[in-house]
Structure formats: structure tokens, C-alpha cells
Amino acid sequence: MSYKTVKYGKKAERRDYSKMLHQVELPNLIEIQTKSFEEFVETGIDELLKDISPIEGHNGDLKLYFEESSLSEPKYSTIETKIRDLNYSRQLSARVKLENAITGEVRESTVLMTDLPMMTPSGTFIINGAERVVVSQIVRSSGVYYTSELDKKINQIKYSAQVIPTRGAWIEFEQGSKEILYAKLDRSKKVPLTTFIRALGFTTKKDIEETFGRSSLITNTFEKDETKSPNEAVIDLYSKLRQGEKVPADAAREFIRMRLFDARRYDLAKVGRYKFIKKLDVLARAEGTYLANDIILDGEVLVAKDTHLTKEVIQILAQNRDAFRKQLITKENNLQNETADEILATTLPEGGNTLYAKENVVNLKTGEVLVKKNEAITEEVLTNLRKNRHSIDEKVIKYFLTEDVYKKESLRQGVISEILDVYVYDDAGDKSNVIRIIGSDQREDRIFVAVSDIVASISYFLNLYDGLGNVDDIDHLGNRRLRLIGELLKNQFRIGLARAEKNIKDKMSTTNFNDATPANVINMTPLVGAIKTFFGSSQLSQFMDQINPLAELTQKRRVSALGTGGIARDRAGVEVRDVHNSHYGRLCPIETPEGPSIGLISSLATYAKVDEYGFIKTPFLKVVQNGNETSVTKEVIYLTADEESDHVIASAATPMDEHGLFIESRVIARRNGETGIYDANEITAMDVSPKQVVSVATSSIPFLEHDDASRALMGANMQRQAVPLLQPTSPIVGTGVEYRAAKDSGAVVIAKNSGYVTYVDGKKIIITPEPTDTIKSGSKTLYKVGGEFDYGIAKKLYETKSVQNDQYDLVQFFRSNQDTLILQKPIVMQGEYVDAGDVIADGPSTENGELALGRNVTVAFMTWEGYNYEDAVIMSEDLVKHDVYTSIHIDEYEIETRDLKQANGKEEITREIPNVGQEAIKFLDERGIIVPGSEVKEGDILVGKITPKGVFEPTPSEKLIHAVIGDKAKEYRDSSLRVPHGGGGVVQSVQYFSKKNGDQLPTGVNEQIRVYIAKKRKITEGDKMAGRHGNKGVISKILPREDMPYLADGTYVDIMLNPLGVPSRMNIGQILEIHLGISAQKLGIKVASPVFDGVTNDELGAIMEEAGIAPDGKTTLYDGRTGEPYNNRISVGVMYMIKLSHMVDDKLHARNVGPYTLVTQQPMGGKAQNGGQRFGEMEVWALYAYGAAHTLQEMLTIKSDDMIGRNKVYYAITHGQEIPKASIPESFRVLTRELQALGLYVELIDANKGENEAIKSLVDNSSKGFNKGRF
């Protein structure tokens, strides 16, 4: 039996049964949030400002430059921000430069841009006083994708391609029905592929055939193509984009160029360029083929014709790409380049990089030639042009006076591509025709698509028909990436800045430079709005699930495919939702919601990280070959899903000796997601841990490997619903992740520096760190650098205030987002030494720094009088008496006083409430606000408030009378804050905010008062309980202790569960847990049994034997009522059970009198509206079946929507009269009104009276004898 005792922090200790040789530490679990936001603040904001800078006015006179940005300090702390219902933010300012392009005059100033919400150290945002989390979004990466489908009509595989940017127009290629290839730009109508190729700059049919090779597909496409030149092709493409509109070729070319080659409209981002280069590399397709021509470099043959292109040959070619780079399109024909008439300077062959004027530049007023044709463009020439700018053609000025004039011509290049001619052998050994492979220029680094990329993507598309290249799996994690908080925020900033840029341009055009300053030109309202909308209402900005630390942590590590730019829930198919083999170690295959979001919302695996491109990577241990031996090193390598495909990866459970050598010569391993048996010398990497495949919540389920997947899913999800208990206890049977989960969640307090605890109480902990300098007090040396540092010295330093102590304020009785209690308790003692990173105070649902969601209770799997039928739970009254499952809940109630309309007076907080007795206001203080500590029940007044009834302007004498007598009953009505239906408890605290005190309140609000009521909820029948294996149930009976079964030693069972809940559910983990739990409890230890690497059956048997428990884990139980033993031995053990947030107190509801819906006049539904129970169609059938006619009529009329009838019945009951007959239900009247709306005249004639009953109403006298009964 192999185990080791492991300490978790300073306080917790467990017997660890894991078998892993190299234990790799978990990464910081919320780093995905914090690191991304830090990058955005440090570099992202400045990058965005640089992108929009400079902003030019429409007439080009003014230019606005954004320089570096800066952030102020937050105004309030995180706690203070929550109390005041504000945003935890810092003011973002930027240094701005406004330049007059004519005179060169510059004005600089610092401009406030927006309030930027800041991330707290625990990875959350505080918006309007509530903590929120921004969930990461998983989206399709930009890149080039190829797919195939079988056309059943012609029994042939058709390919299609998509060139997808991060932002901008899509390019698509596809095969039509008659073996004709088509292209589409920006989802427009399709054009023949050859038309699209011509538009790129290929002049003749011969050029195209020579470049891409001859094939029947290309020939068929030419027959469909009606264009004969690039100009015609561009015009045709433009007309498809603009629904048949016709323009000259230059205008069409410029329009398409702006769509594809303008960085502001088309953005591949860093990830898109990375994917383009990887996918469109000529060598990636060429591997495994044979060269059709010699590759010649500097006059020598680098690689000879007919060479088989193995990995080694490919590496040689990769280092000498110049040997097969060729220009396909000249710079004059390249679609990417600006049209010739817009290019006013050019390079000359003899002039190197110097620019020369293409035409004379003339002063339009005087006719003087300022720059002659072919004159070099020097700084003196540019200065002369600036002086005469008002006398020169505007187009000329804009061209020459832009700062990148020298770049403009250098960007006018031909299209360079990397080209190889190859051939392959088919299955019969026959040699194929020569296949032309064109790859993109691997030196390309621009963030928009280049013509060489488009040419390469077309070549790849055609190569697929030749059997070269691979189609893509869009669900593979190599093709899906994460947008983290930094990128999501950057996108919102970009939208806000783009709108602000438009406003600024408009303002600049109407502003005289003499009056212009950066401050009055800039209007950043759109930016403020974009950020506010994102944090307030985006699908990815979620109200934080703060019910327990695990729920917090899981939400921060959640990955959603929904939201802007993602997938719509109702359009998502099975493939997107399904588990993919590339999820291994990246996304948890188990933790996902049940219901419509299944598979669209996932959770990051325990060890997963995110790379610079947004791809999820997971760690592996490097495996090396030492001669004939294969050993696993301690070196950790992180691989993305794409990179992993090159490796053969052994399972973490592979047997090894103590030196890390594989014991067996054949090993189970994965390659490309497929599991097989490989020779040990083929292995290149190994999983770091068995738990790397699952998420944090899933990895906290012991014996996960023995549970059915759907039950494990429920177990992982239900742990997040655990209510923090009054006395939390960490599990006896844990998995070892409890400590890290609690530590990284942000719920506990962690020491920043090492030192001695010199002061501790319930509200704060003070730690005195070891000084870095010698400390003296007068002539006495208190501490000498390098000398001894103990508690005595630390205490003196603290008392004399000689060093800067670390003070940690603990959160006391704070309300969470889910109305549960947040309370931090110190777990260190005065005089104790703590290291940096140690947990020094527990939070909710933690014990000694470990996650503690529930309690360890004695469980028996047995039935008891049928009370645990259908998963119901029977519980001992002992658990109620000893507050084992008691939790504290805090409700917040708020009231405001406002100024009313003119002459209506204002609302007041007061103790003098009209028509209310002294008993009702006995707990209010002199202001009229409840005193903390008071016990209140529903209907009690919390804050006395009166509101003026109507318009009045009291005379001076009336004011005097009011002042003396204080009689407010006549003019004021009671609008006090009362405890609502179902509320009550002890008033825990009161917060008072007032404009007079300088508090920030909404417009029109004078005072704001919040009352917090705490309530202790003991567990009761109807509450939901669960284990960690998806074994959930509702408490059906709480039995007195004396009726509960007991063991031979007198131990009473705490909970009885139904044994029938186990076999069909296949969650056997709970059975193993109870046996290990009771064994560990008897031995006085706690156990860590990690998932897939925990206690084996043999080890469990040995532990049970050590604890003196029968091998089958069963024992004789005695009936508490009779003292007789039960006929059969019963499985009894210790299980970790949690109380879930689905409590009966929140759900049970009864209606006496309540509101009715406006149109149908039927009772409202739901607890929140104090609604009734719907008597539905099936319930009506039940009354039909019994023939209960009168009851049925009552249900459908006076108890539902018969307005006249119910008022008459009320009158009859209060006056002791007979119950009258029902009249017409309101829903019938609604039907008649709807028919009338269609132009039909509807009457319901009473046969006896001859009256139209359908038009009777409450508001006229048509209901005889009814009005006298109205109140």
C-alpha cells in the first residue's frame, strides 16, 4: 500500500495515494483572467490609440495625435465601492497633440477619455456595486479553411474553401453543379473562379493556365467566364458586390482594394497571419511528393529532379526559400497596389530607393512648376510644397505631405509566391501528371490579406482535387481560439473609438484653429457608452456566481461559444457541442450545463493555459531516448492542439521505475487523438497528470473513474450550488485539489510577505515582515540585517511602529450576490510564522484553507418505511439540532426619498407615520430607521417614509400648526419600507446615504437607506441535498434520533439513502467513498484520492482492514424504534454531503389575496408576483371525471377571472348572504373584443332578460345590484 503524507498549506494534512512520479504544480487558476487584463492595460490601450492616430479633419487642416495613456488611482477600495454601489474603476487619460498642418503649430494637453473598470486581484469587476465576471469566448480562428462533402447526385466529392479574417470581408471558393469553380467575395453573388483570378492581376488565359496548371475544372470555368481582361473582371466583381451597379474599372478596383487591403477595414490580427503562413506554406503540401524539376540556387542544383520530398529534404528547402520564389504578377497589375493615377512618385532603376516625381507639380495660381518630372523628392522639395499648399491640387498635397510618402512606393510590389512542381504515385504505382503547388510568401507580416495569400489559397483549393492537402475539422481546437477579457475589451474600445473618431472629424471640420484645443475637439461619449454597454449588458459579462468559492472559480475559468461573434443557441448543431479529441487537457469533457446550453459552455481543464494567439495549450513531460532506454524527464512542454498532432503521447498512468524509465517495451499512447499501443522508443511526450483532462470542479470528485459521465456532470455542477454552512468541514475523502481551488478562488486571505503574526482578531490580522535594513530605537538596535529574527523582535518592531506592517482587513458579515453570507475567519495565531502565499484566514465554505462545501456524515444505504422512495433523503434530527447543515442568508432591502414634481413637496424619512400604532414603530430610532439587532417578521416596518398625497402649498399658519401638532395624516400617505412576504430575521446592519453628506446618489434621489436582514436557515423537509457523484435528493423526513437506525457500538446513522438509486445510475464512486470515508474517520486521517490516480480496490481493502472494517463494508444495523437488528447487513459509511441552494423556504408559497393580470383578469403566476397555482387543462379533466360541476364552475369563474362574480361573492360572504351565481369570465369578454377588432359584432343574449351580457362591466350600472357591493 503506497501512500505519502502531504501537507496542504500549514494547517491541512492528507494521506495521498497518487502514483505519479513527477508531481507538476497546478498553474494559477485565475491567470487566464488577470494576465489578459494586465496585457490590455499595459499595451492594448496604447496600441488602439496608435491605430486611430492621427485623426484628420475632412479638409485636412487639423491633425489629432494620441500619445501615451495613463491611469489614475482608484477613488475607493473594492469594499467601499461595493457599499456605495459604484464602479471599481480608474480614470483613463491620454496625452493629445493637435497640429495645424498648414502652419505646423502644435497644441498639447492631457484629456480625460473614460472611466475604465478595473479588475480586482481575484479576477472580477465591480459594476454598480455588484461583482461581475467576463467569461472567455471560444470562436473560430481567422485563417483559411477547406471542407469537403459528397455530392450524392454525381457521387463525387466537392471541396469548398473559406478565407476568414478576424474583421472584414470573407473570400469563398466552391464547386458548382457542372464542374465549374466559383468565387464569392463578402458573401455576395458568385463569379467564376477565373474571373476572380483575373481581377487579382493575371492578364491572359495563358498566364492563369501556366500559373495554376491545366485541368478540366479550370477549362470548364473558362467556358463560363465572359471576361477577357483584369479590368472587365474587376467591374464584374464590383457589380456582384453592389447588386448590378456599374462603375469605371479604376473606381471598382479602388473599392475592392479598400475592402481587402486596407488595414482599417480588414484585419487578420496576429493569429490570422500565423494561421495563413502555417496553412498556405508550399512545403506543408509538398511533403511526401516527388520533385518534377531541379531546384537551382546560385547556379547550382540544390535539390535534384525526382527527389522524394522527405522531412529532411523539406528542412533543406525551408532554409533556401529564395530558390523557388517567383513573381507571378507585376506591380502595375497587382490589385493590391493603388491605381497608377494616385501614385505621383516612383523609383527609377538607377536611383535606388529615392523617389522621383512622376509628373510636373504646378502652382495653380501662378503656373510656376514647383517640382519637375523625374526630380528627386528631397526634404527641401517637400518644404517648398508645404509653403505653396494652398495653390496646389489637393490630391498632390495629400499624397506628398503624408508622413509615409516614402513607404507608399515601396508597398507597390509585384506578387511574390513560392512555387514547386511535383508529382505523386497512385496506389497502382503509376506516376501522376505534374502538379503545380503555390504557397504564400512566408515573409509576409501584414495584418491584411495579401494577393499572394489569395493565390496560394486558390492553389490549395485546386490541389485538393489532385489529392494534395488536407480538409479542415472546424471543431478541432487548432481552429478554435479563445477571446479573453483583454481582447473582448479591446474590441469594445475599438468600436467606441471608431464612433468617437467620426465625432472628432465632424468637430474638426467646423472648428477654427484659433479656438481649437484638444479638449473641445474631443468627445469621448461613444467610448464611455461602448464600455458601459459591454460590462452592463453583454452576454459574456455575467453577474458573479458568488454562492461558494468553487462557483466563483469555475465562472472565471468558463468558456462560452455564445455571445457577439459566437454561435446562437438555437442554431448550434450536435458537432459544435460534442466532445472532440483535441479537448484532451484543454476543455473538460464533463463539466457543461444540462439543457439548451450543453456543449456550448465548457470549462478549462486544470492545467490548461492560453497562448498569445488565444489557442488553448496543455502541458506534457518531455520524453527522451537514451540509447535503448526511453525516459521521462521533468521538463514540461506546453503544446497547442495543432502542435500535439506531431507527438506520440503516453498516458500519465504508464508504469515507470523510480528513474523515470518505462517498465514495459509497449506502451498505450495517443497520436492525433487516436489511442493505440506503441513501442516505448516512439513515445515523444507524456501527460503531466491524470487529472489534466478534467476541470477543477470535476477533479474534486473522488473515484470519478467509477461514475457514469452524465452523473459526474451533475456532481460537478451541483458542487457549484452548495450553500456555505455555519460550520464547514473539509471532506475526509478529498482529491488533493481542495487547497488550490480555495486559494485561487479569491475567497480566502493570503499573506503577501513572510513574517510573524503580531496581532490577530476577528476583524484584522497584522503580520510584521523581516526588515531589509537595520532598525534602531534611539541608541538601542532592535534588529540587525543578517541577524536573528524571531517573534520577540517582531513584536517589538510592531509595538514601536519601526517597520511597515502588513495589515489584512477581514470581510465581516458581507452579503454575496446570491444573498449568502461572506465571513472571513483567521486561522493563524499570534506569534505564528507565516510564509508568503500562505492562507491566513478562511472564507465562506473553506476550512484550514481547503474547500469545504458540505459535511462528512454517516450514511446507510437502506429503505425506511418507503420515505426514501424516488431518491428522497431521510435525515436525523441531530443534524438539525447541532446546526450541521445550517446556513446564514442576508437579504437587502432598499428605500429612497426623492424630490417630487414642483409644489408636490418631497418624501420624508420619519417615525411619525399616519395611521400606525406605537407597537409597529417600537424598533425604529428617532429618525424612523430600524435599529440593528431587532428581530423582524413579515409586514414589520423597516424604514418609516411618508409621501405627500397631492398638490398643496401650505399657508404660514398651516405650517405653524404642522410644526406644533405634527398631524401629517391628512396630507401624507404611508409609503414605508416593510418586510415583504416570506421575509424576516434579525436586522444585521443599516446603511444610510444622503446627498447632504456628499454621497454619490442617482439623479433626483435625496436619501438612500439599505437594511440588511440576516436569517439562520436550519435544514428542513423539502431542502435539496446531494453528494459529489450526481446523487441528489430531497429531504422527505427528519426523524428523531431515537428512531434512526444505529450500529453495534451505538453510533447513530445521520442520513438514509435509497440503495435503488445506485445500480441504474452507475455512480459507484459513492459506494467506494463511504467505505474509504468510514475507514479514514476511524483512523483519524483525511485522504487525498486524485481522479484516475487514486485509491485502488486493493488499497481500499487494505485501509478497511487497517481500520477494522469488514471486507464487504457492511455491518449489522439495529432499528432505533424496536432495538431489533435488521435482517440483512447494510452498507454504512461516511459520505461528504452538501446542502444545495434549492431550499424550500425560497420555493414554498401560498396565495390568499393577490394581484390579477390586466387584460385577462386571471390571478398572476409565481412567487415573486404573489401569484396563484394555475388550474390547468388536465386539472379540469380531473374534475370532469368526477362530475364535480359546481366545483368546476367555481374554479373557472369566481376563483379565476369573473370580475363581477368575485366581487359579488366577497359581498355575500361579508354580509352572510348566499353565494350568488357566477357571471361571465373576463377571458370571454377578451375573446369578444378580439372578434370585434376583426369587424365582427358579437352579442351574448340572456334568454330570460333579453339583455346583452357580453358588454356588462364593473364601471357602469349594467350589473344590477352589484354596485352597492363594491368597496
Curated annotation (Swiss-Prot):
<dbReference type="InterPro" id="IPR037033">
    <property type="entry name" value="DNA-dir_RNAP_su2_hyb_sf"/>
</dbReference>
<keyword id="KW-0808">Transferase</keyword>
<dbReference type="InterPro" id="IPR007641">
    <property type="entry name" value="RNA_pol_Rpb2_7"/>
</dbReference>
<keyword id="KW-0240">DNA-directed RNA polymerase</keyword>
<dbReference type="InterPro" id="IPR042107">
    <property type="entry name" value="DNA-dir_RNA_pol_bsu_ext_1_sf"/>
</dbReference>
<dbReference type="InterPro" id="IPR007642">
    <property type="entry name" value="RNA_pol_Rpb2_2"/>
</dbReference>
<dbReference type="InterPro" id="IPR010243">
    <property type="entry name" value="RNA_pol_bsu_bac"/>
</dbReference>
<dbReference type="Pfam" id="PF04561">
    <property type="entry name" value="RNA_pol_Rpb2_2"/>
</dbReference>
<comment type="subunit">
    <text>The RNAP catalytic core consists of 2 alpha, 1 beta, 1 beta' and 1 omega subunit. When a sigma factor is associated with the core the holoenzyme is formed, which can initiate transcription.</text>
</comment>
<keyword id="KW-0804">Transcription</keyword>
<dbReference type="Pfam" id="PF04563">
    <property type="entry name" value="RNA_pol_Rpb2_1"/>
</dbReference>
<dbReference type="Pfam" id="PF04560">
    <property type="entry name" value="RNA_pol_Rpb2_7"/>
</dbReference>
<protein>
    <recommendedName>
        <fullName>DNA-directed RNA polymerase subunit beta</fullName>
        <ecNumber>2.7.7.6</ecNumber>
    </recommendedName>
</protein>
<dbReference type="GO" id="GO:0006351">
    <property type="term" value="P:DNA-templated transcription"/>
</dbReference>
<dbReference type="InterPro" id="IPR007645">
    <property type="entry name" value="RNA_pol_Rpb2_3"/>
</dbReference>
<keyword id="KW-0548">Nucleotidyltransferase</keyword>
<dbReference type="InterPro" id="IPR019462">
    <property type="entry name" value="DNA-dir_RNA_pol_bsu_external_1"/>
</dbReference>
<dbReference type="GO" id="GO:0003899">
    <property type="term" value="F:DNA-directed RNA polymerase activity"/>
</dbReference>
<dbReference type="InterPro" id="IPR007120">
    <property type="entry name" value="DNA-dir_RNAP_su2_dom"/>
</dbReference>
<comment type="function">
    <text>DNA-dependent RNA polymerase catalyzes the transcription of DNA into RNA using the four ribonucleoside triphosphates as substrates.</text>
</comment>
<dbReference type="InterPro" id="IPR015712">
    <property type="entry name" value="DNA-dir_RNA_pol_su2"/>
</dbReference>
<dbReference type="Pfam" id="PF00562">
    <property type="entry name" value="RNA_pol_Rpb2_6"/>
</dbReference>
<dbReference type="Pfam" id="PF04565">
    <property type="entry name" value="RNA_pol_Rpb2_3"/>
</dbReference>
<comment type="similarity">
    <text>Belongs to the RNA polymerase beta chain family.</text>
</comment>
<dbReference type="GO" id="GO:0003677">
    <property type="term" value="F:DNA binding"/>
</dbReference>
<dbReference type="InterPro" id="IPR007644">
    <property type="entry name" value="RNA_pol_bsu_protrusion"/>
</dbReference>
<dbReference type="InterPro" id="IPR037034">
    <property type="entry name" value="RNA_pol_Rpb2_2_sf"/>
</dbReference>
<dbReference type="GO" id="GO:0000428">
    <property type="term" value="C:DNA-directed RNA polymerase complex"/>
</dbReference>
<dbReference type="GO" id="GO:0032549">
    <property type="term" value="F:ribonucleoside binding"/>
</dbReference>
<dbReference type="Pfam" id="PF10385">
    <property type="entry name" value="RNA_pol_Rpb2_45"/>
</dbReference>
<dbReference type="InterPro" id="IPR007121">
    <property type="entry name" value="RNA_pol_bsu_CS"/>
</dbReference>
